Amino acid sequence: MVGGSTVASGVEMEDVVKRIKANVRIPVIIFPNNIASITGAADAMWFMSLLNSANTYYLIDSQAIGAPMVKKLGLETMPMGYIIVGYGGAAGYVGQARVIPYDRPELAVAYASAAELLGMRYIYLEAGSGAPQPVSPIMISAVSKYCKSTLVVGGGIRDAKAAIAAKIAGAQIIVTGTLVEEESKVMDRIREITTALTAQA
């Protein structure tokens, strides 16, 4: 996944994607914050709606503006309902989200259910980059129980313990973005997390 809440340059985004693809043999998926994130250099993109935003730009306007470009580029799209909870971080601030409190899992279930009924194949529960605590296992479990869409969870997951807790609760994809930016021995930490998750399977 390549992207973030403060990406402002399409040229920069394309350069980053090309550099990654030149060094890593795995698909690169765009995690967009607006139309500046779109690049044909990627393999696919999350075509997402920030469901609890108070601003229609993040709900549907940016998607409508960007859709013709996405179709022209022939990018594979992965429809996602994006839900910001708890801390929220930069994503919550930039996206003008009405952040769902950690202790209100029923609200997350309601938004996730709406995403599923709208045909979104993925649901992302986001606590925000660098969140002091991750999405609670109770909230993850509640959404997993009521929704069949693939469940993505991110924000505040810094170690194997937190990743395993999210997986046991029902997360099917786990995002550890800020870890790459903050950890000096990033490969060791990622290996620790992936090894623990594989062993828990």
Regions found by a protein language model. Give the residues of each.
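Glycine/Thr-rich beta-alpha phosphate-binding loop at enzyme active sites
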Residues: G3, V94-I140, E181-E183, R189
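Glycine-rich phosphate-binding active-site loops on the catalytic face of alpha/beta enzymes
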Residues: M1-V7, A44, M48-L59, A127, ...
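Alpha/beta catalytic cores of nucleotide-metabolism and tRNA/nucleoside-modifying enzymes
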Residues: T77-I83, G88-G89, D103-A110, K145, ...
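Metabolite-binding pocket within alpha/beta catalytic cores that recognizes anionic/polar moieties
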Residues: M1-D61
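Conserved anion-binding
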Residues: S37-E116
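Catalytic cores of alpha/beta
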Residues: I30, N34-F47, Y146-T176
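Structural preference for beta-strand elements that scaffold enzyme active sites
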Residues: M1, P27-I29, A44, M80-I84, ...
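Alpha-helix-loop-beta-strand connector modules within alpha/beta enzyme cores
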Residues: G10-N34, G66-M78, Q133-D159, I190-A201
